[in-house]
Amino acid sequence: MFSEEKPGRNFTDLPDVDDGYNIHVMYVLPKDGVDKEYDLDSKISMLMYQIDKWFNSKTKDRLFADGQNLKFDRKDDNKIDITFLRLDINDDEISKHGIQAVNVLQPAISRFGFNDPKKVYFIIYGGSNRDVCASSQLPSYATEGVTANTAALYYPGKRSGSCIENNGGFKPEFNETAKAALHEILHVLGAVPQCAEDHLVFKDEGTINDGIGGHLSIPGDIMYSVQSNKTYDKAKHLDFKSSNYYNHNNENCLDIAKSRYVIPTVSNPQLPTFSSK
């Protein structure tokens, strides 16, 4: 019995209890990573709870009176299905890619069979990152032939300035870590679409965000960011104007309220690539 085979730990994606369109959560370690058992000690489950609680609170009395929830992959007992995976590459080979590290993680987990076309993958990566605390693939910016279905939280993250600082870490509250995680999950679900009226694309100014889109320049929004990528603006809103990415009236533009990956789900739901241009 390998040391990582512990009671309650899953090494596979368990059979779905829904239609298979869901956000599958994974605790992923590099080859040389230390197992902190975040999948077993409720740390990851608590993070997902805080994310979903905040999302639901910001969607109440909008498209649905009781709001919506993120459609996480769950088990028969309604607990989140979390898969443990140790990769075959070392931390340095991932961390050095900075904000683009998620583009290393996606094909890495795919090699182990985590490539269900119905699923979006959210990775809690137990290692470092040269530049950022979290990052995501952007479906509307993906080039042909590239799979863009993965978002990642790097924990503890940055080698210079840990991601658990500035009111971060696994805590029973919607803090900086939870905000970063939800921000990236919304990215991989398609927010902010390029067709949104306030969609922001960063200029080429020699920063890690050069040329990256999918944001808003509206302080307080969960999708707000700045060119330098360094902001501790408190997230207060989820498209409070209902004009960019949630419950808006632009019928040809992606709307998270109509996503396949939220519940309740509308009758004709959208995938993250809906009207990507």
Where on the chain are the PLM-derived regions?
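Secretory-pathway extracellular proteins and peptide precursors enriched for disulfide-bonded cysteines
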Residues: 62-64, 124-130, 153-155, 214, ...
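A recurrent domain-boundary module in secreted/ectodomain proteins
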Residues: 237-277
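Catalytic zinc-binding patch centered on the HExxH motif and its immediate surroundings
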Residues: 129-154
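Cys/His-rich zinc-coordinating "finger/knuckle" motifs
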Residues: 140, 202, 260
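Short consensus segments that form the blades of beta-propeller domains
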Residues: 16, 140-144, 170, 211-214
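Propeptide-to-catalytic entry region of secreted or membrane-anchored zinc metalloproteases
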Residues: 2-120, 124-138, 164-169, 175, ...
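Structural recognition of the beta-strand scaffold that forms the well-ordered cores
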Residues: 22-27, 119-125, 151-155, 179, ...
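The catalytic-center signature of Zn2+-dependent metalloproteases
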Residues: 158-251
